[in-house]
A protein has these predicted regions:
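Catalytic beta/alpha-barrel core
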Residues: 78-81, 107-108, 128-130, 168-170, ...
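Bateman/CBS regulatory modules and CBS-like beta-alpha motifs in cytosolic regions of diverse proteins
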Residues: 34-48, 55-57, 86-126, 131-133, ...
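Short beta-strand/loop segments at the ligand-binding rim of alpha/beta enzyme cores
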Residues: 47-54, 100-105, 164, 220-230, ...
Length: 500
């Protein structure tokens, strides 16, 4: 057996490092943390304002989390443990949550009942809807105020709506002009109509207020919040991808446990050629794996095999690469091709984000750090007087089981789609709980604040400079112990630190 210069057999020569194995060296710096640029590309054509994505997991990201992530400048990736219709509806909820102008507003027919109109308002969290005829001509508007004191929910909308003429705007109106009309007439909604009176859009005062409230929000060219979605690698995935693209999703992630698999690569290429949005491939953990994704034509590479807190792939299958090394190796292939890298999993502290970026990632995907947030879909539990939220891996039994519904949308991620009986599944994840952490905005404030401090220490004014200027020192177990608070009993907890 051949050996390297240290006498280690070549087969065992690679040293794998993860976040706790390294620290970043402080460097000469003229950079102030509050002046750094945290924007980055997560794929060839999608840019966010902070380098954070919420994971495509059913206890982490649905519409509420995706909306909150985009408002803070990041982006959420909707999980795929849903039917195609339900996942498309999640995209629609995000895209309709706010926009510069709603180009396809929800409308109601004048013969609809108040109960039906109220249900629409509740579903999309809106305060009113335009009333149109079958040809799309604007007839009036019905709002919560019109319906508030109507006890008979079977009455028709035409009986209580505010009919035309309404204050309207022309298609192409500027934001300044629209705001002036809203202010002058003391209204909250401005329908936009063409010369024949057909409804073409809707501008609301709520969207102007949200733009002021969330100035760092990540938005598309139409002023709508960014959102991504996960799909699999199967014939069903092609239908799912096309439906999601039609719904306005900004990018797709072909989400498999082993992206360096010929079947997965074939489906990535097929999906990429059939949709008009960026496609990110994953997951891989080697340079060769990343190169295979690049060769398949993906717009982004997602890195991570087994680093997540709820993942058991490394012990069940004996497979994986410690995450810092995995990111570094994958970036050698991806960066040369101009393809952004996403480090997925294994992050415990804000300092790990900077380490991932210095290793070669353009952004990171977070699961456990966000699972305890108010906006996550996990169940809230009280245990011994403390609050927790449920969290699980997508390879856990709970995520892969069909539960009598005849279909699971998660099994194929781990190449077990053909397993017909739940008791024959081989899980690669666990189920558990994480402490409740409150609103996402507070959590991201600490994470991004920690990243800004990292960039200041390194002397990196941008995310790109983190990779070029970041230098590592490998540490021992004693060095790791020294890095954490020690020789003291902590009496007041910090919002950004807890001993794991």
């Amino acid at each position: 057996m051949t050996a390297n210069v240290d006498g280690v057999p070549e087969k065992f020569a690679t040293l794998g490092l993860t976040y706790d194995d390294v620290l970043l060296l402080p460097g000469a710096s003229e950079v102030l943390p509050n002046a750094v640029d945290t924007s980055t590309l997560i794929s060839r054509n999608v840019r966010v304002n902070i380098p954070l994505l919420s994971a495509a997991m059913d206890k982490v990201t649905e519409a509420r989390m995706a909306i909150a992530m985009a408002r803070q400048g990041g982006v959420g990736v909707l999980h795929r443990n849903l039917s195609i219709e339900d996942q498309v509806n999640q995209v629609d909820l995000v895209k309709r949550s706010e926009s510069g102008m709603v180009t396809d507003p929800i409308t109601v027919h004048p013969d609809a009942t108040l109960g039906e109109a109220d249900a629409l308002c509740a579903k999309f969290r809106i305060s009113g809807v335009p009333v149109t005829d079958p040809a799309g001509k604007l007839l009036g508007i019905v709002t919560n105020r019109d319906m508030a004191f109507e006890s008979d929910r079977s009455r028709q909308v035409r009986e209580v709506m505010t009919p035309m003429p309404l204050v309207t705007g022309k298609v192409g109106i500027s934001g300044v002009e629209a705001m002036e009309l809203l202010r002058r007439h003391k209204i909250e909604k401005l329908p936009l109509v063409d010369e024949t009176g057909v409804l073409k859009g809707l501008i609301t005062v709520k969207d102007f207020k949200k733009a002021e409230q969330y100035p760092n929000a990540a938005k598309d060219a139409e002023g709508r919040l960014l959102v991504g979605a996960a799909v699999g690698a199967s014939p069903e995935a092609l239908d799912r991808a096309q439906a999601l693209a039609s719904a306005g999703v900004d990018f797709l992630i072909v989400d498999t446990s082993h992206g360096h698999n010929s079947n997965a690569l074939d489906w990535m290429a097929k999906i990429k050629s059939s949709v008009g949005v960026d496609v990110i491939g994953g997951n891989v953990a080697t340079r060769d794996g990343a190169q295979a994704l690049v060769d398949a034509g993906v717009d982004g590479v997602k890195v991570g095999v087994g680093p997540g807190s709820i993942c058991t792939t490394r012990v069940v299958a004996g497979i994986g690469v410690p995450q810092v090394t995995a990111i570094y190796e994958a970036a050698l292939a991806a960066r040369a091709a101009g393809v952004p890298v996403i480090g997925d999993g294994g992050l415990q502290y804000s300092g790990d984000i900077g380490k991932a970026l210095a290793a070669g990632a353009d952004s990171v995907m977070l699961g456990s750090l966000l699972a305890g947030c108010e906006e996550s879909p996990g169940e809230l539990m009280f245990i011994n007087g403390k609050q927790f939220k449920s969290y699980r891996g997508m390879g856990s039994l709970g995520a892969m089981q069909s539960r009598g519904q005849g279909r699971s949308y998660s099994k194929d991620r781990y190449f077990q789609a053909e397993v017909s009986s739940d008791d024959k599944l081989v899980p690669e994840g666990i189920e558990g709980q994480v402490p409740y952490r409150g609103p996402l905005a507070n959590v991201l404030h600490q994470l991004v604040g920690g990243l800004r401090q990292t960039m200041g220490y390194v002397g990196a004014a941008s995310v790109d400079e983190m990779e070029s200027k970041g230098r590592f020192v490998r540490i021992t177990s004693a060095g790791l112990k020294e890095s954490h608070p020690h020789d003291i009993q902590m009496t007041v907890e910090a919002p950004n630190y807890s001993r794991k």
